[in-house]
Amino acid sequence: RQNWSYALIDRDIYDINSYASRFIQEQAGRTLLSQVSTTVTYDMRDSRIEPRSGYVVRVGGDYAGIGGGVNYFRSRADAQYYIPFERWLNDPDFVLVLAAGGGILTPLGDKDDRIVDRFFLGGENLRGFYLGGAGPRDLATGDSLGGQILWTSSAEMRFPLPLPNEIGLLGRAFVDVGSLHGIPSSYYNQSLYPGARPVDDADPRVSVGVGFSWRSPIGLINIDFGKPVIKQDYDKDQLFRLGFGTRF
Protein backbone atom coordinates (compact mmCIF):
# COMPACT_ATOMS: atom_id res chain seq x y z
CA ARG A 1 0.00 0.00 0.00
CA GLN A 2 1.06 3.59 -0.52
CA ASN A 3 0.35 6.54 1.75
CA TRP A 4 0.68 10.24 0.97
CA SER A 5 0.72 13.16 3.37
CA TYR A 6 1.35 16.89 3.39
CA ALA A 7 2.61 19.01 6.27
CA LEU A 8 2.77 22.78 6.63
CA ILE A 9 4.58 23.69 9.86
CA ASP A 10 5.66 27.07 11.17
CA ARG A 11 8.72 26.20 13.26
CA ASP A 12 10.22 28.53 15.84
CA ILE A 13 13.49 27.75 17.64
CA TYR A 14 14.14 30.07 20.56
CA ASP A 15 15.49 30.37 24.09
CA ILE A 16 18.66 28.45 23.18
CA ASN A 17 21.14 27.96 26.00
CA SER A 18 24.10 30.33 25.66
CA TYR A 19 26.43 27.36 26.17
CA ALA A 20 24.98 25.46 23.21
CA SER A 21 26.99 24.78 20.08
CA ARG A 22 27.39 27.64 17.63
CA PHE A 23 25.79 25.39 15.02
CA ILE A 24 22.66 25.15 17.17
CA GLN A 25 22.61 28.81 18.10
CA GLU A 26 22.59 29.85 14.46
CA GLN A 27 19.40 27.82 13.96
CA ALA A 28 17.41 30.24 16.15
CA GLY A 29 14.40 31.81 14.49
CA ARG A 30 11.39 30.79 12.47
CA THR A 31 11.22 28.63 9.37
CA LEU A 32 8.23 27.46 7.35
CA LEU A 33 8.30 23.77 6.43
CA SER A 34 6.13 22.76 3.49
CA GLN A 35 6.60 19.03 2.93
CA VAL A 36 5.08 16.27 0.82
CA SER A 37 5.74 12.71 2.02
CA THR A 38 5.02 9.27 0.67
CA THR A 39 5.60 5.75 2.00
CA VAL A 40 5.16 2.45 0.19
CA THR A 41 4.70 -0.58 2.46
CA TYR A 42 4.85 -4.24 1.44
CA ASP A 43 3.73 -6.29 4.43
CA MET A 44 3.83 -10.10 4.40
CA ARG A 45 3.89 -10.69 8.17
CA ASP A 46 1.53 -13.15 9.81
CA SER A 47 0.46 -10.43 12.27
CA ARG A 48 0.92 -6.68 12.51
CA ILE A 49 0.57 -6.74 16.30
CA GLU A 50 2.90 -9.59 17.22
CA PRO A 51 4.52 -11.08 14.10
CA ARG A 52 6.32 -14.41 14.27
CA SER A 53 7.00 -15.01 10.57
CA GLY A 54 7.17 -13.13 7.30
CA TYR A 55 8.63 -9.76 6.44
CA VAL A 56 7.77 -6.11 5.91
CA VAL A 57 9.50 -3.54 3.69
CA ARG A 58 8.91 0.22 3.75
CA VAL A 59 10.33 2.76 1.29
CA GLY A 60 9.55 6.45 1.44
CA GLY A 61 10.62 9.99 0.81
CA ASP A 62 10.00 13.57 1.92
CA TYR A 63 10.25 16.57 -0.37
CA ALA A 64 10.35 19.98 1.30
CA GLY A 65 10.36 23.23 -0.61
CA ILE A 66 6.92 23.84 -2.07
CA GLY A 67 6.43 27.41 -0.94
CA GLY A 68 8.33 26.98 2.33
CA GLY A 69 11.67 28.23 3.54
CA VAL A 70 13.28 24.79 3.79
CA ASN A 71 14.38 22.84 0.73
CA TYR A 72 15.55 19.21 0.74
CA PHE A 73 14.79 15.66 -0.33
CA ARG A 74 15.00 12.93 2.31
CA SER A 75 14.79 9.27 1.33
CA ARG A 76 14.31 6.45 3.83
CA ALA A 77 13.82 2.70 3.87
CA ASP A 78 13.60 -0.10 6.40
CA ALA A 79 12.80 -3.80 6.52
CA GLN A 80 12.23 -6.53 9.09
CA TYR A 81 12.37 -10.30 8.56
CA TYR A 82 10.88 -12.69 11.13
CA ILE A 83 12.18 -16.26 11.34
CA PRO A 84 10.16 -18.62 13.59
CA PHE A 85 12.03 -21.25 15.62
CA GLU A 86 8.91 -23.14 16.69
CA ARG A 87 9.83 -26.11 14.49
CA TRP A 88 13.06 -26.71 16.41
CA LEU A 89 12.24 -25.41 19.88
CA ASN A 90 8.55 -26.33 20.07
CA ASP A 91 7.49 -22.85 21.20
CA PRO A 92 6.07 -20.10 18.94
CA ASP A 93 7.65 -17.37 21.07
CA PHE A 94 11.17 -18.20 19.84
CA VAL A 95 11.60 -15.79 16.92
CA LEU A 96 14.72 -14.37 15.25
CA VAL A 97 14.21 -10.84 13.91
CA LEU A 98 16.61 -9.36 11.37
CA ALA A 99 16.20 -5.66 10.61
CA ALA A 100 17.89 -2.99 8.52
CA GLY A 101 17.18 0.61 7.64
CA GLY A 102 18.67 3.82 6.40
CA GLY A 103 18.16 7.19 4.86
CA ILE A 104 19.81 10.02 2.96
CA LEU A 105 19.09 13.73 3.33
CA THR A 106 19.98 15.79 0.26
CA PRO A 107 19.88 19.58 0.69
CA LEU A 108 18.47 21.45 -2.31
CA GLY A 109 19.32 25.02 -3.14
CA ASP A 110 22.19 27.10 -1.78
CA LYS A 111 21.43 26.85 1.95
CA ASP A 112 22.78 24.31 4.43
CA ASP A 113 20.29 21.78 5.76
CA ARG A 114 18.99 22.34 9.28
CA ILE A 115 19.87 20.16 12.27
CA VAL A 116 16.23 19.40 13.07
CA ASP A 117 15.74 17.86 9.60
CA ARG A 118 18.70 15.47 9.82
CA PHE A 119 18.79 11.90 11.03
CA PHE A 120 19.84 10.96 14.54
CA LEU A 121 21.42 7.75 15.79
CA GLY A 122 20.77 6.21 19.19
CA GLY A 123 17.83 5.25 21.35
CA GLU A 124 15.29 3.20 19.42
CA ASN A 125 17.49 2.65 16.35
CA LEU A 126 20.73 1.93 18.27
CA ARG A 127 20.14 0.68 21.79
CA GLY A 128 22.91 1.29 24.29
CA PHE A 129 23.26 4.91 23.10
CA TYR A 130 21.15 7.94 23.93
CA LEU A 131 19.08 9.45 21.12
CA GLY A 132 21.69 11.48 19.24
CA GLY A 133 24.36 9.78 21.33
CA ALA A 134 26.30 8.56 18.28
CA GLY A 135 27.28 10.42 15.14
CA PRO A 136 28.39 13.98 14.30
CA ARG A 137 29.04 16.20 17.31
CA ASP A 138 30.52 19.53 18.32
CA LEU A 139 33.30 18.53 20.71
CA ALA A 140 33.45 22.08 22.08
CA THR A 141 30.03 21.65 23.71
CA GLY A 142 29.18 17.96 23.35
CA ASP A 143 26.03 18.73 21.34
CA SER A 144 24.79 16.29 18.72
CA LEU A 145 24.55 17.72 15.20
CA GLY A 146 22.63 14.98 13.40
CA GLY A 147 23.72 13.60 10.05
CA GLN A 148 22.70 13.34 6.42
CA ILE A 149 23.47 9.65 5.84
CA LEU A 150 22.17 6.93 8.17
CA TRP A 151 22.17 3.15 8.17
CA THR A 152 21.26 0.65 10.87
CA SER A 153 20.92 -3.10 11.24
CA SER A 154 20.08 -5.45 14.06
CA ALA A 155 19.65 -9.10 14.96
CA GLU A 156 17.32 -9.90 17.83
CA MET A 157 16.39 -13.26 19.32
CA ARG A 158 13.06 -13.25 21.13
CA PHE A 159 12.24 -15.96 23.61
CA PRO A 160 9.71 -16.88 26.30
CA LEU A 161 10.50 -16.35 29.97
CA PRO A 162 9.88 -19.02 32.64
CA LEU A 163 6.72 -17.25 33.81
CA PRO A 164 3.00 -17.86 33.29
CA ASN A 165 1.85 -16.79 29.82
CA GLU A 166 -0.91 -14.61 31.25
CA ILE A 167 1.72 -12.24 32.66
CA GLY A 168 2.61 -11.30 29.08
CA LEU A 169 6.41 -11.08 29.32
CA LEU A 170 8.81 -11.92 26.48
CA GLY A 171 12.60 -11.69 26.64
CA ARG A 172 15.13 -10.80 23.96
CA ALA A 173 18.86 -10.58 23.27
CA PHE A 174 20.11 -8.25 20.56
CA VAL A 175 23.02 -6.88 18.57
CA ASP A 176 22.57 -3.41 17.02
CA VAL A 177 24.86 -1.80 14.45
CA GLY A 178 24.60 1.68 13.00
CA SER A 179 26.40 4.58 11.38
CA LEU A 180 25.56 8.25 10.91
CA HIS A 181 27.59 10.92 9.16
CA GLY A 182 27.39 13.91 6.86
CA ILE A 183 27.41 17.56 7.94
CA PRO A 184 27.80 20.74 5.85
CA SER A 185 31.36 21.52 4.77
CA SER A 186 30.87 25.07 6.05
CA TYR A 187 30.99 23.69 9.61
CA TYR A 188 34.77 23.40 9.28
CA ASN A 189 35.19 27.09 8.46
CA GLN A 190 36.67 28.59 11.62
CA SER A 191 36.02 32.12 10.40
CA LEU A 192 32.30 31.32 10.38
CA TYR A 193 32.29 29.21 13.55
CA PRO A 194 35.22 30.26 15.75
CA GLY A 195 35.85 27.86 18.61
CA ALA A 196 33.64 25.10 17.20
CA ARG A 197 35.11 21.59 16.97
CA PRO A 198 32.91 19.54 14.66
CA VAL A 199 33.66 15.84 14.33
CA ASP A 200 32.10 13.59 11.72
CA ASP A 201 33.01 10.00 10.89
CA ALA A 202 31.24 7.09 9.25
CA ASP A 203 32.67 4.40 11.54
CA PRO A 204 29.96 1.95 12.64
CA ARG A 205 28.88 1.71 16.26
CA VAL A 206 27.92 -1.65 17.77
CA SER A 207 25.98 -2.50 20.90
CA VAL A 208 24.72 -5.68 22.54
CA GLY A 209 22.11 -6.19 25.19
CA VAL A 210 19.05 -7.88 26.60
CA GLY A 211 15.54 -6.72 27.31
CA PHE A 212 11.93 -7.70 27.62
CA SER A 213 8.50 -6.62 26.47
CA TRP A 214 5.44 -6.60 28.70
CA ARG A 215 1.93 -6.63 27.30
CA SER A 216 0.56 -4.42 30.04
CA PRO A 217 -3.07 -3.29 30.44
CA ILE A 218 -2.07 0.13 29.06
CA GLY A 219 -0.15 -1.22 26.07
CA LEU A 220 3.26 -2.63 25.23
CA ILE A 221 6.13 -1.60 27.52
CA ASN A 222 9.72 -2.25 26.41
CA ILE A 223 12.74 -2.31 28.71
CA ASP A 224 16.25 -2.71 27.29
CA PHE A 225 19.72 -2.88 28.81
CA GLY A 226 22.34 -2.07 26.17
CA LYS A 227 26.13 -1.91 26.20
CA PRO A 228 28.21 -0.30 23.43
CA VAL A 229 31.08 -2.54 22.33
CA ILE A 230 32.32 -0.38 19.44
CA LYS A 231 32.03 3.39 19.84
CA GLN A 232 33.89 6.70 19.83
CA ASP A 233 35.11 8.38 23.02
CA TYR A 234 32.70 11.27 22.51
CA ASP A 235 29.59 9.09 22.10
CA LYS A 236 27.01 9.06 24.90
CA ASP A 237 26.00 5.70 26.37
CA GLN A 238 22.58 4.74 27.69
CA LEU A 239 22.58 1.55 29.76
CA PHE A 240 18.84 1.47 30.48
CA ARG A 241 15.98 2.43 28.19
CA LEU A 242 12.24 2.39 28.80
CA GLY A 243 9.93 2.63 25.83
CA PHE A 244 6.22 2.51 25.11
CA GLY A 245 4.55 1.28 21.97
CA THR A 246 5.08 -1.49 19.46
CA ARG A 247 8.54 -2.98 19.15
CA PHE A 248 7.12 -6.04 17.39
Predicted regions and their residues:
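C-terminal outer-membrane beta-barrel translocator/porin domains of Gram-negative envelope proteins
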Residues: 3-197, 234, 242-247
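C-terminal structured "cap/appendage" subdomains that terminate the fold
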Residues: 187-233, 240
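A generic beta-sheet turn/junction motif
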Residues: 175, 214-218, 248
